[in-house]
């Protein structure tokens, strides 16, 4: 079967699963809400107004991870994957279509999230907020980071074949482990996927990565996870 019909079928699956629509809605709401709360705190002479405006992505990316995880985990319940592969025997093509079907809505919602968060942040911070040039970089970086984290989770879920296992690893990692490693060794932490991608959300940076190189590192993590997921789907029984 050609790629486009497979992609269309995977997009239909996403539109018809309420949990996935809820996860995408949570990306926007959680990111904007936590960013508004962070922006409302006192910020006299804030050295990093851009990150204050986009602070909520630290929590919004959890919803993005839940989206990517659930989209793939649904295939491993009730024999759904066997039916899918019966219709699309080319497993790498199917998994590529699944990844694209996750990336497209994640990017669209990410761009919406970036725009809403920027407008909220500038409205709350006022004159102390980021410039429009910084804000545009932050909005695009926000969209790319959310998309890449959703894809990273999707690839890991394909390897583990369990949404619960994936979330049990990634959520504590994002909320606890990443910060602990960051306190112990900033050199290592700079190259973790969540921290590398968020460099684009800072007004200035002094580490080894810049905004776009940081996103490139995050993209490498996501690509590695997706390749591992494709290998797992191709080699293991459905």
What is the predicted function of each stretch?
Residues 1-7, 147, 187-188:
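Short, membrane-interfacial amphipathic segments enriched in basic
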Residues 5, 18-71, 95-160, 172-179, ...:
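Secretory targeting signals
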Residues 5-13, 82, 86:
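Short amphipathic alpha-helical coupling elements at transmembrane boundaries
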Residues 10, 72, 88-90, 156, ...:
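Generic structural signal for small/hydrophobic residues in well-ordered secondary structure
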Residues 47, 68-87, 91-92:
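Transmembrane helix boundary and interhelical loop/hinge segments in multi-pass membrane proteins
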Residues 179-196:
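Extracellular/periplasmic helix-loop junction at the C-terminal end of a transmembrane helix
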Residues 229-238:
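Membrane-interface capping segments at transmembrane-helix boundaries
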């Amino acid at each position: 079967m050609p790629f486009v019909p497979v992609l269309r079928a995977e997009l239909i699956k996403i539109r018809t699963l309420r949990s996935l629509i809820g996860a995408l809605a949570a990306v926007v709401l959680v990111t904007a809400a936590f960013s508004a709360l962070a922006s409302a705190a006192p910020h006299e002479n804030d050295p990093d107004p851009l990150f204050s405006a986009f602070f909520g992505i630290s929590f919004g990316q959890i919803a993005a991870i839940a989206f990517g995880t659930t989209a793939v985990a649904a295939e491993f319940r009730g024999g759904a994957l066997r039916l899918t592969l019966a219709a699309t025997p080319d497993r790498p093509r199917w998994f590529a279509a699944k990844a694209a079907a996750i990336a497209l809505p994640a990017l669209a919602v990410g761009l919406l999230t970036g725009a809403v968060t920027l407008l909220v942040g500038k409205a709350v911070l006022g004159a102390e907020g980021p410039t429009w040039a910084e804000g545009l970089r932050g909005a695009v970086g926000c969209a790319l980071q959310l998309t890449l984290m959703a894809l990273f989770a999707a690839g890991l879920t394909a390897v583990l074949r369990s949404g619960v296992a994936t979330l049990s690893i990634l959520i504590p990692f994002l909320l606890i482990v990443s910060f602990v490693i960051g306190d112990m060794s900033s050199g290592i932490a700079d190259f973790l996927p969540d921290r590398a991608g968020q460099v684009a959300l800072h007004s200035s940076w002094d580490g080894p990565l810049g905004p776009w190189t940081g996103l490139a590192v995050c993209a490498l993590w996501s690509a590695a996870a997706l390749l591992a997921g494709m290998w797992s789907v191709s080699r293991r029984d459905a």
